[in-house]
Design a protein with these regions (language model features):
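Short beta-strand segments in beta-sandwich/barrel cores
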Residues: 34, 43-44, 60-66, 103-104
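Phosphate-/nucleic-acid-contacting segments
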Residues: 159-218
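Polybasic "coupling" helices that flank or enter modular domains
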Residues: 123-182
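Cyclic-nucleotide recognition modules
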Residues: 72-129
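Glycine- and acidic-residue-biased ligand/ion/polar-headgroup-sensing regions
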Residues: 50-69, 77-80
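Inter-domain helical "communication" segments and dimerization helices
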Residues: 3-14, 28, 36, 106, ...
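Surface loops and adjacent helix of pleckstrin homology
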Residues: 67-69, 87, 107-109, 205, ...
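Cyclic nucleotide-binding regulatory module and flanking cytosolic helices
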Residues: 1-43, 50-51, 81-82, 87
């Protein structure tokens, strides 16, 4: 039985919505709608034999997956934008897939850089890039040198922080599995034990609430 304690998780800075909206407003002076043909359509930041581009998420969300192992990294909801790193290597590490109903616009990376200079938005870009870097470090920290129990608890906390309408549409197991690829048997055993101990309330596979502080050890 695993005896590692649940870690005191450090959460990243809050999403800088005002900063993101400022950048989107500037970029929309040169952006064009991006046609989304179907749910889970792949959105390329670095199209083959074409200039890199910046993607603006105006409504809905993109799901971001690691290319190497198809692990879902995060659901990025509007308002949001991606591609300002300008790095082909980083762009190719992830695959961006649109959700049904997502409203996206795009502009060339070079034009986005020009607009940043024209509108003196260097601080906004730096603040947003800091947020992205912090979130990436937070996600990585969840999975490195952690036990299955610690990881399950961390993603239960993430689910708890979701808006209720989104949380009650989200399968607890699917959410954990998509982000971790942990074995079903291990995850379900932990969830069952936490339910029996009346630590969590799960109905129809969805998290209703965390009822009390989760045990430090399992």
């Amino acid at each position: 039985m695993d005896k590692r304690p649940v870690p005191d998780l450090l959460t990243p800075m809050l999403k800088p919505i005002e900063t993101i909206n400022t950048l989107i407003t500037a970029f929309r002076t040169a952006s064009a709608p991006l046609d989304i043909k179907a749910k889970d359509s792949v959105v390329q930041i670095q199209p083959e034999n074409a200039e890199a581009r910046v993607i603006l998420i105006l409504d809905g969300a993109l799901n971001i997956y690691r290319t190497a192992d198809n692990l879902r990294f995060v659901r990025a909801a509007a308002p949001n934008l991606f591609g300002m790193q300008g790095s082909p290597f980083r762009n190719n590490l992830y695959q961006f897939r649109s959700e049904k109903g997502a409203v996206l616009e795009t502009l060339p990376y070079s034009r986005a850089v020009e607009l940043v200079s024209e509108h003196q938005l260097f601080k906004e870009v730096l603040d947003f890039q800091t947020y992205l870097s912090d979130f990436q470090a937070y996600r990585t920290n969840l999975l490195i040198s952690k036990s299955t129990y610690q990881i399950v608890c961390a993603f239960l906390f993430e689910l708890e922080m979701m808006p209720p309408e989104q949380r009650l549409r989200t399968s607890v197991f699917n959410y954990i599995h998509e982000h971790t690829h942990l074995a079903r048997s291990g995850v379900m055993k932990i969830l069952s034990d936490l339910r029996q101990g009346e630590y969590i309330n799960i109905e129809n596979g969805k998290l209703v609430a965390i009822l009390k502080k989760l045990p430090r050890e399992y």
